């Protein structure tokens, strides 16, 4: 029995990056031998075990064969006679198909096992598929796109790009389960350059199949005085990259991605203006979130940002009453943390524009001041003072908030 560290751990070590997680392959062993060494079985489709002390995952070397469309249509074979190279050949990219032997004390020993040229592709900054079996798993398209968001200087090798397009044309992407699509998109959004993920998906045609709402934004013009980059799709990519650069959370990045969906449905005769696109964005966003089973935290923030981002940009023109109405519509008084994230997404929208990346955004501070003032109003005390007139409480609290905001930010009520 031999144990090898494989995949991302070897890749990242060669790139001089921190190794976050290690995956292990065990060659020449049976499930019974693993159990005898106190490894705990956890795999459903094929034998995966947890180390008794470190709880890291160890998988028996295996081969796989495509039996049906989609992500789940595979048949696995594992036995002591499966070699390391047979296990590595089923992996997606050459840069992920390298290994090093692990000694009994856990140290990496010996040379890098690199049967498919992964080290050369690392030096050339190329994503290249290992073999023809790449086409058998549509998730690999999403993984390549996600890796592009992480390693933004890498390019997809031409032959790999051709295979990805062929997979899309064959309908393989349509068989992906929504949860897996969301999982890969979410992970890509959290990488350093998420726009690269969408560029790769768009180039192979997959974006139009899994996120047609985003694909439709490319080529849609905007007013150049507001958007020097003009193209709505380009703008959205700049927005998500700005959000990533700031280290914003996944809900903020998803809201940044989806805030302008309605611009794709603007009638041609009114372009490049987009009057009312906020409401159309909400109408498109709801079914998108349902289709991909987007988590509630991401969906709820995205809906607030899609509906209100235009108003958030205009707060310097608002009086106190309009500011309070905006805070109430956004449920900022009850959910101030979510509203803070809405301001982050709005700021990313304002700065995700060509030449305006560092433009001041005083709107955020104005709204933070307004929210502090509005939340300081003692609604309970007002309610007690109107104990016999409950119908008047809501309006009285609202008026008190307007007065507080007017005083705090120095605007008329």
From Swiss-Prot:
Binding site for Mg(2+): 21, 23
Cofactor-binding details, from the entry: Magnesium is required for nucleotidyltransferase activity. Nickel for phosphatase activity.
Domain of life of the organism encoding this protein: Bacteria
Annotated ATP binding sites: 8, 11, 91, 143, 146
Presence of keyword Isomerase: no
A molecular function (GO) term: cyclic-nucleotide phosphodiesterase activity
Coiled coil: none
Gene3D superfamilies hit by this protein: Beta Polymerase, domain 2, cca-adding enzyme, domain 2
Cofactor(s) listed: Mg(2+); Ni(2+)
Described function: Catalyzes the addition and repair of the essential 3'-terminal CCA sequence in tRNAs without using a nucleic acid template. Adds these three nucleotides in the order of C, C, and A to the tRNA nucleotide-73, using CTP and ATP as substrates and producing inorganic pyrophosphate. tRNA 3'-terminal CCA addition is required both for tRNA processing and repair. Also involved in tRNA surveillance by mediating tandem CCA addition to generate a CCACCA at the 3' terminus of unstable tRNAs. While stable tRNAs receive only 3'-terminal CCA, unstable tRNAs are marked with CCACCA and rapidly degraded.
Subunit structure as annotated in this protein's UniProt entry: Monomer. Can also form homodimers and oligomers.
HAMAP family: CCA_bact_type1, CCA_bact_type2
Family, per entry: Belongs to the tRNA nucleotidyltransferase/poly(A) polymerase family. Bacterial CCA-adding enzyme type 1 subfamily.
Notes on the domains: Comprises two domains: an N-terminal domain containing the nucleotidyltransferase activity and a C-terminal HD domain associated with both phosphodiesterase and phosphatase activities.
NCBIfam families: PRK10885.1 (NF008137)
Official protein name in the record: Multifunctional CCA protein
Gene designation: cca
């Amino acid at each position: 029995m031999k144990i090898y560290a494989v995949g991302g751990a070897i890749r990242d070590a060669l790139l001089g990056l921190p190794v976050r997680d290690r995956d292990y392959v065990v060659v020449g062993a049976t499930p019974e031998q693993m159990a005898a060494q106190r490894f705990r079985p956890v795999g459903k489709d094929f034998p995966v075990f947890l180390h008794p002390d470190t709880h890291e995952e160890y998988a028996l070397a295996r081969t796989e064969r495509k039996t049906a469309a989609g992500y789940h249509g595979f048949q696995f074979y594992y036995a002591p006679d499966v070699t390391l190279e047979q296990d590595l050949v089923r992996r997606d990219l050459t840069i992920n198909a390298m290994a090093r032997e692990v000694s009994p004390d856990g140290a990496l020993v010996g040379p890098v096992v690199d049967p498919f040229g992964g080290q050369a592709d690392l030096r050339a900054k190329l994503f290249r598929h290992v073999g023809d079996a790449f086409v058998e798993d549509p998730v690999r398209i999403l993984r390549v796109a996600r890796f592009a968001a992480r390693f933004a200087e890498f390019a997809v090798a031409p032959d790999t790009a051709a295979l990805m397009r062929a997979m899309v044309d064959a309908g393989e992407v349509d068989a992906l389960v929504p949860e897996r699509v969301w999982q890969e998109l979410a992970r890509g959004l959290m990488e350093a350059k998420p726009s690269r993920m969408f560029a790769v998906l768009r180039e192979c045609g997959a974006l139009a199949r899994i996120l047609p709402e985003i694909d439709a934004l490319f080529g849609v013009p905007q007013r150049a005085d507001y958007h020097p980059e003009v193209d709505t799709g380009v703008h959205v990519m700049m927005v998500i990259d700005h959000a990533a650069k700031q280290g914003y959370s996944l809900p903020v990045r998803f809201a940044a991605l989806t805030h302008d969906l309605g611009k794709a449905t603007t009638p041609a005769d009114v372009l490049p203006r987009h009057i009312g696109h906020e409401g159309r964005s909400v109408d498109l966003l709801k079914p998108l979130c349902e289709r991909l089973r987007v988590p509630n935290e991401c969906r709820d923030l995205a809906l607030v940002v899609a509906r209100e981002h235009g108003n958030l940009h205009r707060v310097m023109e608002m009086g106190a009453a309009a500011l309070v109405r905006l805070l109430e519509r956004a449920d900022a008084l009850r959910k101030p943390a979510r509203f803070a994230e809405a301001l982050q997404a709005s700021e990313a929208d304002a700065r995700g524009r060509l030449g305006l990346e560092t433009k001041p955004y005083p709107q955020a501070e104005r709204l933070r001041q307004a929210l502090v003032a509005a939340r300081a109003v003692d609604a309970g005390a007002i309610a007690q003072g109107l104990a016999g007139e409950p119908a008047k409480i809501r309006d009285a609290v609202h008026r008190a908030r307007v007065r507080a905001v007017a005083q705090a930010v120095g605007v008329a009520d």
